[in-house]
């Protein structure tokens, strides 16, 4: 072969790579068609995975393309190439000892550290990834699969859980079928251990590892034996990744794994003299849970705590072990006061104490807890523990940072520390009971008047109402049915030393467990997501539960909203409804929810994310343009080289997993709030993220949402609608930070506010803006024998704040985020502004020791409330 000549395989891989990058440059907006481009990345992965040698060819071409990007300064192609390089290295079975691919990659990506954010941070993370792979081959694959399968070791207990939230009424049946396949039970722990061990030994020894022989010997091992071998292997890889010299680390790891193999009884299959054949070991399907979701709250996520309690319980117990020695002296000093408070619990029944002690002993012996014990334990504490009250935070209002030597003292525990944890649980519970009783004796009212919950045209009338005290103490929509199912160690108050995991921070612990929340829907669903996110923040601020164990990541998959027919849908097939435990909360199915003749919702939020991140537009937003039958097809089943290999998934499932695994940078979407005044004088505050419709457009949506009754009511257009006289006061923001207020009175049929996110030019603005669309009546003709007829004109104004007031208290309707369940009637005043986080939180830790020189005093600043949606590269400049 002549120098510079390429083989047919190299040409095919190069062509597939070019197709992946097609249309991602600065001129991508001029592309007239984009259907099918989302399959290019999936096609490239399928082509490369057919032969282990293809991965090295693709990596060479990615590096060559990356060097061209640096020479030409093509910013838009760097992030996709970096993601392709990362995913390809992750799936590469083995790098030959004489290969310098990773070293060349490190030199190539090191040159991009001078580029602006986020390009430099992407390359910095990629360099860290390359350094770990040079020292411990395959360690990133091991960490990913270990977390997704929930396989913990002594020093690494992090896990990753994926939750799919779909509304069966709005999502096509094919999507539900794919979600059902993803949520089916994955590989058993025995099979997962075998997969990880095969990958670890092949990544280290390469073709000199007899993979078939090793697979047979691993299958003959018991689960306990596999767990012991895997623990030693994982610990060896982690230790090797911390060695300074890469060559020394690889040699040490090779020697260590060979010793592990000899100890396990299969020395003949490792480091064989005769090289064999490499095998591609695909990434197993991640653990997924699928739920039917159409609420304004994320209370359903608490079920994950119940399902994952075996993994989460050691984590919280370890945190308490680090704090026991610090608390012993304080507990001994406070014994006199605690004895008086514990006397309050003595008035309870003896059965409650017995159930509590039996639960504590069962926790010490093992993670398996019977549901009867859980229920009795929670019922015994239900008088003193509440999950949504502001007063509950007093127990954990003051936090102290951990001592630096906390981890070193873990091995020197005293015998009585296990009992101290139970004692502190009694102590905290009795203190809450005393505080509650003292408040009831004093007769002090709750802080603040009750808020009027926004009425809904479609909300059920037979839903149970909350007690007045809860309605005043919490503005969320809790579901108390789930609490009795959670173990007591989850419902117990957080330790005052417990570090609360932030919702969004660049300094999060990489070893923490991750909860991926994947939501399917249109702009209507994005409104539900932001309301649920706001409620979750409020609840977790008052009483951390989910954020004690998980860092939350939100993923958004746009789908076209299916039109209803006006008649109830037929019962869902069996495959569309994932089986749930008999004691789990029941979720309504499509037949129960019914289908209304809804208008087709827009997908502006997903288009906005696509404009910020072209790789999101290509691989996530592009899925919406393909028919479901194409996305839900699978490849032809091929003979599996190894028994236990994962089955072929539909294309949509592969792309969803790709999105969840490699989208690591959030885009912050601004949230807006509206303060509504009703004709009765009551006020309420609601939030939205995409649109607010006012007047005739909201009333029309309400009529269409009424189902068959809409035919009787009739629907008129803006030309036949009765106009409203509205006073509109708006503010136009400027880059300088100054705002100019304008006041006008208009005769309108509709006033719509929407996020300015539809055009590429709007991304260049440094100020967040809303588009105010006015449907103004220029002239109204009212003939005696016919309906009134309006001559209308439309206009648009960019605003950041606006007040709309009905003249002479004229009422109008308001709809939030195109949601038929969030239509509010009889509104006379509407004020819209960006939503801010609470100024102060009682859960903030006490101030640290002042720095020297002391920082100048600054006033309290309120940060904007934003919804973080995960994308591949974040917002590109």
From Swiss-Prot:
Query: What organism, scientifically named, is this protein from?
Result: Sus scrofa
Annotated region Heterodimerization: where?
25-101
Q: Which InterPro entries match?
A: PIK3R5/6 (IPR019522)
Q: Which residue ranges have biased composition labelled Low complexity?
A: 476-487
Q: Which GO terms fall under biological process for this protein?
A: G protein-coupled receptor signaling pathway; phosphatidylinositol 3-kinase/protein kinase B signal transduction; positive regulation of MAP kinase activity; positive regulation of phosphatidylinositol 3-kinase/protein kinase B signal transduction
Comment, domains: The heterodimerization region allows the binding to the catalytic subunit.
Query: What name does this protein carry?
Result: Phosphoinositide 3-kinase regulatory subunit 5
A GO term from the CC aspect = membrane
